[in-house]
From Swiss-Prot:
Protein name from the UniProt record: Histamine H1 receptor
Binding-site residues, histamine: 107, 112, 198, 431
Similarity comment: Belongs to the G-protein coupled receptor 1 family.
Naturally occurring in which organism (per UniProt): Pan troglodytes (Chimpanzee)
Phosphoserine carried by residues: 230, 344, 347, 380, 396, 398
Bias (Basic and acidic residues) ranges: 238-261
GO-annotated cellular components: dendrite; plasma membrane; synapse
Transmembrane segments: 30-50, 65-89, 98-123, 145-164, 189-211, 417-440, 447-469
Spans annotated as Important for agonist binding: 107-112, 424-428
Region (Disordered): 238-292, 345-379
Length: 487
């Protein structure tokens, strides 16, 4: 049986070398292998789409690009591969010109959409790593969907030359009815130009983006290691009372945590004077703030305040006044410290909400002393300033912690992108190198090698859904749940 030439992304039957024959017993094992690859491709990509649809943890902006890539791969496995196998079994194309144009259109569109989906996924990862918190505000499902639609729109532009090349170029090419090929199959300049736009240029840009991603993640890891070498991590923060021995520190030599727990003495220019004729009534202060639903900060308590009845000379009347008891002026926390349990499982949408809550803090508030009321305002502002001071510090470190969590997630996402790009380049580069050779040397064609490079590009659609669970724990758990696989 004659082995026909196969359709491909940017070339249709350009390989015009000597025909080789293959007996049916020799051809059937190849057909079985290719059919198995086709079925596996369809099954795995359907599994990815069902997993994203059924698991809420996978409803993230980043996975929209994965869905786009999976849809393109599904078209390759469900339409392009089977018709290529059918064409392989036939000695000539006998299914008619309309079905041929449909197959060619799906081949070009799906393969290009797969390439562009990897490209926009790479851009998304690049921006997430370079500007994590700023890009999170921009990174919405609406914008991601618009980007994906743009990529598919560009891919569908292939339909124009496939269906109307002779009409627009006003040239008539010799068309063989027993072959399924485009009207521009012998136009070298057009095929080289589209190869550069469809593959070489996106690939070079992706390599540049990924180099930047790798550099940014590496620098971030080195920066965090440097910080962790001198400061405790956010999950280890536990505010402790003042050192009873009162070890003296030189100005400017205090660590940030010592500044955080330091009492702002004399912040208002004086200390609180209690009335000698009255006894201070101590009571435990209520909770300053409680974030029961927050996954990073569980519950923080303020220090105890004293309700001190005071009488001032200026007013001549007594009233209750909130003052700081210096003997209880430390910040108390829960025995478990700051609860960070479950922070690693925060979804991207939750991370977006949390990161937006950590807004830029205002500058520290200074106090002014009025004549006759200086000591009274001093005590009040000391307590309030200490609360504000501590809260601003906690929000500042919480912001850094959220940024750190985001970078850890992006490091894993960058790893996933690295595997996807490696599979993409390894699968497609042999075909495009071979294509550039035969584009200028039509006699330099080995028919079996040509077919091998075509199917190697198709196999990229089979490998992509295998990469997701290897690099994403949520995909892995969802796949096991759907397939009823017990760990």
């Amino acid at each position: 049986m004659s082995l026909p030439n196969s359709s491909c992304l940017l070339e249709d039957k350009m390989c015009e070398g000597n025909k080789t024959t293959m007996a049916s017993p020799q051809l059937m094992p190849l057909v079985v292998v290719l059919s198995t690859i086709c079925l596996v491709t369809v099954g795995l990509n359907l599994l990815v789409l069902y997993a994203v649809r059924s698991e809420r943890k996978l409803h993230t902006v980043g996975n929209l690009y994965i869905v786009s890539l999976s849809v393109a791969d599904l078209i390759v496995g469900a339409v392009v591969m089977p018709m290529n196998i059918l064409y392989l079994l036939m000695s000539k194309w006998s299914l008619g010109r309309p079905l041929c144009l449909f197959w060619l259109s799906m081949d070009y569109v799906a393969s290009t959409a797969s390439i562009f989906s990897v490209f926009i996924l790479c851009i998304d990862r690049y921006r997430s790593v370079q500007q994590p918190l700023r890009y999170l505000k921009y990174r919405t499902k609406t914008r991601a969907s618009a980007t994906i639609l743009g990529a598919w729109f560009l891919s569908f532009l292939w339909v124009i030359p496939i269906l109307g090349w002779n009409h627009f170029m006003q040239q008539t090419s010799v068309r063989r009815e027993d072959k399924c090929e485009t009207d521009f199959y012998d136009v070298t300049w057009f095929k080289v130009m589209t190869a550069i736009i469809n593959f070489y240029l996106p690939t070079l840009l992706m390599l540049w983006f990924y180099a930047k991603i790798y550099k940014a993640v590496r620098q971030h890891c080195q920066h965090r290691e440097l910080i962790n070498g001198s400061l405790p991590s956010f999950s280890e923060i536990k505010l402790r009372p003042e050192n009873p021995k009162g070890d003296a520190k030189k100005p400017g030599k205090e660590s940030p945590w010592e500044v955080l727990k330091r009492k702002p003495k004399d912040a208002g220019g004086g200390s609180v004077l209690k009335s000698p004729s009255q006894t201070x009534k101590e009571m435990k202060s209520p909770v300053v703030f409680s974030q029961e639903d927050d996954r990073e900060v569980d519950k923080l308590h303020c220090f105890p305040l004293d309700i001190v009845p005071m009488q001032t000379a200026a007013e001549g009347s007594s009233r209750d006044y909130v003052a700081v008891n210096q003997s209880h002026g430390q910040l108390k926390t829960d025995e478990q410290g700051l609860n960070t349990h479950g922070a690693s499982e925060i979804s991207e949408d939750q991370m977006l909400g949390d990161s937006q809550s950590f807004s830029r803090t205002d500058s520290d508030t200074t106090t002014e002393t009025a004549p006759g009321k200086g000591k009274l305002r001093s005590g009040s502002n000391t307590g309030l300033d200490y609360i504000k001071f501590t809260w601003k510090r906690l929000r500042s470190h919480s912001r850094q912690y959220v940024s750190g969590l985001h970078m850890n997630r992006e490091r894993k996402a960058a790893k996933q992108l690295g595997f996807i790009m490696a599979a993409f380049i390894l699968c497609w580069i042999p075909y495009f190198i071979f294509f550039m050779v035969i584009a200028f040397c039509k006699n330099c064609c080995n028919e079996h090698l040509h077919m091998f490079t075509i199917w190697l590009g198709y196999i990229n659609s089979t490998l992509n859904p295998l990469i997701y669970p290897l690099c994403n724990e949520n995909f892995k758990k969802t796949f096991k749940r759907i397939l009823h696989i017990r760990s």
